[in-house]
Amino acid sequence: MIGSPDLVAFTKETDFSEITTDSSVLPEDLSVPMYPYTGDATPWSKISSAKLKKDFILISEFSEQVGPQPLLTVPLETKACGTFDLNYFSLRIMSVDYQTSLAGSPGYGSFKLNFVEDSKVVLADSREGVFAYVHHLTLYDLEARGFVRPLCLAYVSSDENKIIQQFQRISTEFNKVSECLKTGNRKNFANELEVKLRDLEYTRVVLQKELNTVSVKCSSEREPILNGVHSFERNADEVKLNEKSSHTDEISPQEKDGCGNSRKVEVKLENENRSHFEHEQYGKQRKDKPDKTSCPMPLANKNDELASVEKLIQDYKSLLKQVTCYPTRKLRDSEYSPYEPDDLPQSFDLDLDSQFAGPMLECSVFTYTNTPSQTLQQINSTSSSRFDKRLKTLEELCDDYFYQQALQQLYSIERTFRGDACYLYTQQLCRNLLRNLKSTNFLFEDPCDLDDDVGLQIGQSTIQQPSFLPAPSFLSGPVSLESYASCVEMVPIKLELGGSSQSQVQHSTLNTPSKDNRPQVADKSPAEVEMKGEIISAPDCQGNVESVSNLMKTSISSGDSIEVLGTERSFRSQGANTLVETAMHRPPPLSSATALEGLKQGRVPTRRTCSEDSIEVLCITESISPDELRASYPCAIDEESPEQETDEKNSSQYQEDNNEKSIYVQGKISADHENACLKKLHPSVTVTPPDCPLTLEETSFQDSCQATESATMLLLDEPSRMVPDDLSDCFSYRSTTASTTSECTFPACLPKDKREGGTRRRRGRVGRAALQFMRQFPFAVHAVFSLLSGRTLVVLGSEEAAVRRLVTALSVYLPHLTKYKDSIQPWTSTPLQLTDLLNWKLIGFDRMCSFNPSSLPHCLDHYSRYLSILDVDQKTLHCPTYSGSLINLLVEPKSHFKRGNTYFTFAQSVQSKLVTKAFLLTFSHGHPSPSRPQGSSGTECFLSELHTDDKKILRYLSELIKLHFMEVTPNVLLFSYTTTSIFKL
């Protein structure tokens, strides 16, 4: 068997050879296989079988009639879902009841509402290949089973990482939407309960009247019946007595005569038959006529129906109390604060008997204000089938104002979380880092990036009223003293003059301070007064000023009410809010002389008195002047009168002509000119209460700019009410002589989501414009140097579109002067003033406004030593030459960038390096360093290796950081004599 040919050794030649290993190759466990790249796939995209075109938001409900069903998608279904099965997915996310509650139903003894907290869950659907963040909530409907309508909000995406990474932010924003929907639903649910209670009260009155009518009718019909029965019984008794007497009289003859017995028996039987026949006839008559002898409806049924109605009234009152006592929860975000529901009536026990005038009773009898007037209806005790009723839609379940706010918030959420998960995560990291760089992040970062939730805000200081909605009642109503509150909520305080022990209480409001000085149009709203062109005379205004001052000295108070009218901190906390609420209905401005007369008032010594249940004012000063209390009144920014502005322009022009002859040393303005500019540019903001204008002097820069931005945003929402002066340069700090034109627009006045660079799309647009500018002008680096060194750049042209396009491109390189305002004027045709150069660093100027359009305008030629001029029509640039190296990468004509977003991000990275160097230059003084030579400062060592032009850039950025750190605005125009060159294509 050993030598058998069937046994063959199965071996290879390589089995016994040595295996060679390459030392340069990675081990197999560390090697990464190559990515199977295809044309449509990318390494960072996850291949998914989802049928979605993009992420969307789905609103679904579990209907008691048809089951789970989709209600709404954001954006529309045709744009987002594609072939995605919404019905199946709604069944998937609503298959579990996350809002289980113990709410009672009409079958139980009493109704009870349990306000359940929202539930949040992340679901994955393997069939559709999608993931969803699902937010469950409960709305209330009077016609629904158990009064509940289960709903859910779902953010549907094919990227699981996006849902997990952004879970916290998505949850926070959906909480806002849910709170908005539930607040509006509680408002509508309370209104429905009011209507139901009115109908029940009306039904109870009708039933009581019907019950009284039926009882009276039945009692009147019962009397003849009883009378007939009694007369019949009397006749029967008489017949019996007669028969008895006849029977006794015939006893003796009967004994005597036995023959007459048979005849007497016959008479007796005949009488019995007659009485029986009469009984039958009477019973037959009662059966033939039942309607005349019985009631229309049994009283027991009426009593039962009335008892059930009264029980329903008590149950619905209990429901209404539960809804109205539920506290409106305030979110921690200051931007989201829904207004409280209107005050509901305290009692529904109204005397309807005196108001009953017929079968139908109007709702005007009731003194409710929450629901519109409608005709009362009688409620039928026999309810119809539940499936015959039509359930309310989502829009009908919520108040219109809150519903539109929720939709606006949902669209904002969809726009914010649109895009790749890596981009969202990087954006979130950058925002967290920028939040810690408050000393430098204002220079080049967009203000939208500095917000925690960009694009997710309903409003800046309060909820912004959509243009397609009417103003709520609390905004459209007249201003009253009760609508203001301070750091102590709803606490009026009594102020008395120092010399008197008692103060006379004036029973008046802010709108009607004095009956004697009240104008004829006092009953009308300020908007109507302004539209009709009626102007209050100066004497009336003077009386109003005195009345307002007296009103502030002696406030409305009672023995048990306390109210804080104003403290030193009240203007900072309430200024922006009162601006938004009252900027749309301010009265026409009065003359400046009258306003100034009202300002020339010294500090009035006052003394506070406290009753047994009063509270001391939270104020540290010894006396309160009317200027300190004006912050409690609604105010709006008003400009100075044209006469005063003209005088200031003339004086400023005279000072400029004289100061042109002065000598400038080392790039600084002389002391006289600086003092004149500072005196001339003293800040002045006009604050307008509802009745007359008053001036509030020495306002801090931050408060004034915030108030300005709020007022201007409100004005931009309604262009029909915009006046040319509302967009003038008086909004910029320390500038009262600048040009006033209706063509001026301010990026700082626009909402945050409308500024340049506020969104990805806008950033891409700005980046593409910058790339086009670099390729169109090879000398673009010199223009960028002018912007980064603090030299004002003017884009001159005859076509507004071309000028605005270049201004948009150059805005990428412009450092912001402060955090609170921008320094860009995209288009103007008014001659420039010296103060404009202090506030604006990038200006678009109209060439056609000059007498000779072919030449340089006179104002630009006059200030040419301070300006760099880019002529769009002639393709020339007049500016100093840049020879440094810090910004060469920023403006490279041969750059290979193709996408605007990519270049915008690259420009921000280069600018961040400049900001880092400027930060070190600003805050590195005095620190010992081993490489620093003896006797040299840190600034000299830091700038020793830089070019002169680069030093100018860093010094300018360092100066801006210093001013921002000290919270001071640039108030001196710094420049230096340098040679300028003309670059031409």
UniProtKB/Swiss-Prot annotation:
Residues 390-895 form the cDENN FLCN/SMCR8-type domain. GO terms for cellular component: cytoplasm; guanyl-nucleotide exchange factor complex; nucleus. Residues 242-292 have a biased composition (Basic and acidic residues). Residues 502-514 have a biased composition (Polar residues). Its main location: cytoplasm. Residues 904-962 form the dDENN FLCN/SMCR8-type domain. Residues 47-225 form the uDENN FLCN/SMCR8-type domain. It comes from the Eukaryota. It is found in: Cytoplasm; Nucleus. GO terms for biological process: autophagy; negative regulation of autophagosome assembly; negative regulation of gene expression; negative regulation of macroautophagy; positive regulation of autophagosome maturation; positive regulation of TOR signaling; regulation of autophagy; regulation of TORC1 signaling. Residues 242-301, 502-528, 639-659 are annotated as: Disordered. GO terms for molecular function: GTPase activator activity; guanyl-nucleotide exchange factor activity; protein kinase inhibitor activity. Keywords: Autophagy, Cytoplasm, Guanine-nucleotide releasing factor, Nucleus. Pfam families: Folliculin. The keyword Cytoplasm applies. Component of the C9orf72-SMCR8 complex, a complex that has guanine nucleotide exchange factor (GEF) activity and regulates autophagy. In the complex, C9orf72 and SMCR8 probably constitute the catalytic subunits that promote the exchange of GDP to GTP, converting inactive GDP-bound RAB8A and RAB39B into their active GTP-bound form, thereby promoting autophagosome maturation. The C9orf72-SMCR8 complex also acts as a negative regulator of autophagy initiation by interacting with the ATG1/ULK1 kinase complex and inhibiting its protein kinase activity. Component of the C9orf72-SMCR8 complex. The C9orf72-SMCR8 complex associates with the ATG1/ULK1 kinase complex. Belongs to the SMCR8 family. PANTHER family: GUANINE NUCLEOTIDE EXCHANGE PROTEIN SMCR8 (PTHR31334:SF1), SMITH-MAGENIS SYNDROME REGION GENE 8 PROTEIN (PTHR31334). This is Guanine nucleotide exchange protein smcr8b. It comes from Danio rerio.
